C-alpha cells in the first residue's frame, strides 16, 4: 500500500475550462501543400486517478447500523468497515439541503446559498437555494479534468419553484456538473410512486407498485446500467458517481417481508434499545470505553409512558423503518457487486456516508401520514390506530396505503449515543454521522475508527488532493469563492496524521446552531417539531410540550486543516491569531497568539464536574471569536425566558493528543460554568 494518496499537482488548472489544444494540421492552397496531424486525445489526469463513488443515506443516525452496534442489518456497510477505514467524528449540518450543498462544493452551506431546505429558499444571502456559479461543485471541476459524472436519487438543492418540467434547468444536477441524472428533485418521495426525472425530462417509473416497484431498487438498477454503458463507451475515463437514496427519509415505505424480519426485535422500546446500542458501540470500539450515555431530553416521552394499547403501533413503525434501511443498504451492495464484476473494485474510492443528518423525529408521536405531523396538524396516536384499522391494520404500515413515519423516540435512539436528532444543529445527534472509506489500491483496512474531526465540506478538497487538482480561480469565467474545507487525504493511510491548526465549521438551522473553532463548540438549541413528543396532562387531554433554548460551549479535539479560516460571516476574527496560526490540542487548548482572552489560559479557574469525575483545568473560552448569537441576550429572564440565550462555557473530560479517541464523542462528562473571560 502507498504511504501517500495525494496526487502530483496537475498544471494549468487555474482557469476552467481548459483552453482547446491547437491543431497541428496546416491547410495549404492545395492538397499537396496541406499537412494533416491527428489531434492528440487530451488527458490531463494521472493514470492512477481513481474512480469516485459517494453513497449518501438520508435521515439516518449512528445508532442504527449493525456494524456500529445498532440492530438494523447493514451487510454492505458492515463489510466496508472490514475492508476500509471508518471515521467516527464526521459531521454534517443537521439538515439535508445544507449538508448536500456543502458536501458537493467543499464550502460552508451558507456561502453556497443553502442555509435551509430548498423549499424555504428566499431572497436573503445564504438562503437563496441556488448554489452560486462562484462556488463550482466538485463534479463540475472533475468533469473539466476528464471525469464522467453522474448523480442518482435525491436532489434537494434546487428551489421548489424551479423543479417543474418548464425549468429553468441551470440549477438542476445537469446544470451543476453532472452529465447524467436520474432521481427526484425534492426532499422526499414516495418509494412506490415517485416523481422521477432523467436529466431534464420528467419520466414515469419503469414498473407499478403492483409489479413490485421500489425506488431504492430502481436507483440501483439505473446506476448499474450507467456503469455498464460507461465501461462500454468510456472505459479509459474515470468516473464520479453520487448515489443519494431517499432512504431513510419519510415516508417509510418497504415491502412487508422486509419489515417482518424485525418482528419482536423492538418490543422493549427506545430507551432499552438505546442502552443496548451504546454498550455494543463501546465493544466494537466505535465510541471510547469511558463514554457516558447522554440522558433523555425532558421533552421526550419515555417508553414506559406510552400506553400499552399504543405500543404495538409504535413497535411496528420501527420494524418498518428497520426493514426500509436494510433494504437500502442491500441495494448499495448490488452497486458494489457491479463494480467488482466490471473490474473497478481496486481503483474505486468509495465514501459511504451514513446519513446527511441524524435520524429524523419529524414523525413526532408516530404517524401514518408524515405530512400531517410536518404541517402541524394536531392528531393523536389513537386516531392513527383507528384509521389503520379501516385500512387493514398494522400490516399496511410501509405499504402504498400509508405515508408512515416512526415516533421521535426511535429517532432519538437511532442517533445514539448523542443528544438530539435531525434539525438540531446544536447537538451531535443532529450532526455526527458515520463515514466509511474504501480504496483497495491505496488504503489498508483498519478496524479501529479514525477519530479526526471532519466536516462534510472536507470531502471535495480531499478529492482534489487525491486527484492532484488545485482549486481553480475561475470557472466558466466566474471568479471562485475560497474552499472552506480541508483535505483529510493523508489520514486514509496515516491514522496519526494531524493538521497544524483548527479551522472553523458551523452548522445552523432555525432549530439550533453550533460552530467549531479553535477546538471549542458553542451551541444554541431550540425546540423543534421532533421534540413535541412528551405527553403532558392538560384540561382538554391534548398532548402539549415545553419549549426552551440554551447555549453552551463544548471542548472538541483538534481538527485537520491548514488555516484557521472561519466559515460564519458573523465571526469576529483575530488577525494576529490567523497570521500566527497557533496550534491547539486537547492538552493545550490555548496557544500563544494575539493576547486576547481566547489565547490566554485561565488556569486559576476550575470547572465543576459530575459526581465521580475528576476536575480539569479550564481554559478561557474563545470569547473574542464568539459568533454574535452566542453572546447576545434578548430580554430579561423574567419577561422573555424563551428568547434568552445564555453564553456559557463547558469542556469535555481532559484528554491528551495521544489519546484522540477520548475526544471522539461528547457523550461523556460535560458541565457548564459561566465564562469569566
Labelled PLM ranges:
Residues 551-552:
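Cytosolic coiled-coil signaling helices that couple upstream sensory modules
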Residues 677:
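Carbohydrate-binding surfaces in secreted/extracellular proteins
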Residues 649-672:
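Glycan-recognition/cleft segments
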Residues 589-601:
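Substrate/cofactor-recognition hotspot
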Residues 577-584:
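Polyanion-binding and phosphate-handling cores
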Residues 1-544, 548, 557-576, 588-590, ...:
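Formylglycine-dependent sulfatase
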Amino acid at each position: 500500500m502507498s504511504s501517500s494518496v495525494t496526487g502530483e499537482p496537475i498544471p494549468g488548472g487555474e482557469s476552467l475550462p481548459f483552453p482547446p489544444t491547437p491543431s497541428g494540421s496546416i491547410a495549404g492552397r492545395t492538397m499537396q501543400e496541406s499537412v494533416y496531424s491527428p489531434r492528440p486525445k487530451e488527458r490531463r489526469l494521472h493514470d492512477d486517478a481513481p474512480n469516485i463513488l459517494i453513497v449518501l443515506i438520508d435521515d439516518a443516525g449512528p445508532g442504527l447500523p449493525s456494524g456500529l452496534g445498532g440492530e438494523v442489518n447493514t451487510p454492505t456497510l458492515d463489510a466496508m468497515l472490514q475492508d476500509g477505514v471508518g471515521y467516527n467524528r464526521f459531521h454534517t449540518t443537521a439538515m439535508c439541503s445544507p449538508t448536500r450543498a456543502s458536501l458537493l462544493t467543499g464550502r460552508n452551506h451558507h456561502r453556497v446559498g443553502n442555509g435551509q431546505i430548498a423549499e424555504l429558499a428566499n431572497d436573503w444571502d445564504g438562503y437563496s437555494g441556488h448554489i452560486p456559479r462562484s462556488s463550482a461543485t466538485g463534479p463540475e471541476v472533475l468533469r473539466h479534468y476528464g471525469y464522467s459524472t453522474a448523480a442518482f436519487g435525491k436532489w434537494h438543492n434546487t428551489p421548489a419553484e424551479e423543479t417543474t418540467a418548464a425549468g429553468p434547468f441551470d440549477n438542476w444536477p445537469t446544470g451543476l456538473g453532472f452529465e447524467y441524472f436520474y432521481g427526484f428533485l425534492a426532499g422526499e418521495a414516495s418509494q412506490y410512486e415517485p416523481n422521477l426525472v432523467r436529466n431534464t425530462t420528467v419520466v414515469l417509473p419503469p414498473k407499478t407498485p403492483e409489479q413490485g416497484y421500489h425506488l431504492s431498487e430502481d436507483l440501483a438498477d439505473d446506476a448499474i446500467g450507467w456503469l455498464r454503458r460507461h465501461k462500454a463507451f468510456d472505459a479509459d475515463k474515470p468516473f464520479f458517481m453520487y448515489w443519494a437514496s431517499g432512504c431513510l427519509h419519510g415516508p417509510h415505505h418497504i415491502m412487508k417481508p422486509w419489515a417482518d424480519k424485525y418482528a419482536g426485535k423492538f418490543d422493549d422500546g427506545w430507551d432499552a434499545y438505546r442502552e443496548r446500542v451504546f454498550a455494543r458501540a463501546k465493544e466494537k470500539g466505535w465510541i471510547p470505553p469511558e463514554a457516558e450515555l447522554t440522558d433523555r431530553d425532558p421533552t421526550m416521552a419515555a417508553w414506559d409512558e406510552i400506553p400499552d394499547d399504543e405500543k404495538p403501533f409504535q413497535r411496528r413503525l420501527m420494524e418498518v423503518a428497520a426493514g426500509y434501511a436494510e433494504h437500502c443498504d442491500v441495494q448499495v451492495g448490488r452497486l458494489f457487486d457491479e463494480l467488482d464484476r466490471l473490474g473497478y473494485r481496486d481503483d474505486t474510492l468509495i465514501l459511504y456516508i451514513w446519513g446527511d443528518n441524524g435520524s429524523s423525529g419529524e414523525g413526532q408521536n408516530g404517524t401514518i401520514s408524515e405530512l400531517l405531523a410536518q404541517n402541524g396538524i394536531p392528531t393523536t396516536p389513537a386516531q392513527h390506530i383507528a384509521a389503520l384499522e379501516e385500512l387493514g391494520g398494522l400490516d399496511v404500515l410501509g405499504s402504498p396505503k400509508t405515508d408512515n413515519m416512526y415516533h421521535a423516540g426511535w429517532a432519538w435512539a437511532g442517533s445514539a449515543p448523542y443528544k438530539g436528532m435531525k434539525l438540531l444543529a446544536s447537538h451531535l445527534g443532529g450532526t455526527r454521522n458515520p463515514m466509511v472509506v474504501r480504496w483497495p489500491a491505496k488504503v489498508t483496512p483498519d478496524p479501529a475508527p479514525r477519530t479526526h474531526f471532519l466536516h462534510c465540506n472536507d470531502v471535495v478538497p480531499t478529492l482534489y488532493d487525491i486527484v492532484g487538482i488545485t482549486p481553480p480561480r475561475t470557472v466558466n469565467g466566474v471568479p471562485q469563492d475560497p474552499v472552506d474545507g480541508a483535505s483529510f487525504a493523508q489520514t486514509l493511510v496515516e491514522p496519526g496524521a494531524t493538521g497544524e491548526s483548527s479551522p472553523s465549521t458551523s452548522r445552523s438551522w432555525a432549530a439550533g446552531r453550533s460552530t467549531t473553532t479553535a477546538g471549542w463548540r458553542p451551541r444554541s438549541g431550540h425546540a423543534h417539531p421532533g421534540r413535541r413528543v412528551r405527553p403532558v396532562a392538560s384540561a382538554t387531554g391534548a398532548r402539549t410540550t415545553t419549549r426552551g433554548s440554551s447555549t453552551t460551549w463544548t471542548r472538541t479535539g483538534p481538527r485537520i486543516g491548514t488555516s484557521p479560516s472561519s466559515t460564519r460571516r458573523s465571526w469576529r476574527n483575530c488577525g494576529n491569531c490567523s497570521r500566527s496560526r497557533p496550534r491547539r490540542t486537547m492538552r493545550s487548548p490555548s496557544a500563544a497568539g494575539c493576547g486576547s482572552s481566547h489565547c490566554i489560559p485561565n488556569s486559576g479557574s476550575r470547572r465543576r464536574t459530575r459526581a465521580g469525575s475528576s476536575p480539569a483545568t479550564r481554559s478561557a473560552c474563545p470569547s473574542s471569536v464568539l459568533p454574535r448569537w452566542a453572546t447576545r441576550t434578548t430580554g430579561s429572564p423574567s419577561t422573555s425566558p424563551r428568547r434568552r440565550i445564555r453564553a456559557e462555557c463547558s469542556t469535555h473530560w481532559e484528554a491528551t493528543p495521544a489519546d484522540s479517541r477520548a475526544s471522539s464523542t461528547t457523550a461523556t462528562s460535560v458541565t457548564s460554568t459561566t465564562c469569566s473571560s
